[in-house]
């Protein structure tokens, strides 16, 4: 990837919100595409979700995408808003309660808090994956230092 393209990818990562993830099915072994939001907190990319949709919204309901990433952590992170680019990535399931609390407390994850009404439910049950980019995008500086677009707002 050229330096100009890497700069465009960095800008997109800081500005965009909706991506596709292409994962290998945990049980089926088939490639699955899921549209999902991502957030950038403290220079790291995260995929998050609300705990579930049971009788009690705070109950945990498993998600296929997270089951797929647990079984097969390498996946494709597909930018599709301001630019189109497919990035190789590795998922790291976030279990550390301090990291989970820090991410779910960030301004950019306010939508998730509003959906559940409980930071504690998110910390305890919300799906969360840290995304490590691989290949030429590995090591991109996703902090807000330098000239970058303003961060996007999650509705």
Give residue ranges: language-model regions.
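Short low-complexity stretches enriched in small and charged residues
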Residues: 1-7, 33-34, 40-47, 84-88, ...
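Extreme N-terminal tail/first-helix region
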Residues: 1-20, 150-155
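A generic structural micro-feature
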Residues: 13, 28-30, 69, 123
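Short beta-strand segments
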Residues: 16-57
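Short, structured beta-strand-loop surface elements
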Residues: 51-148
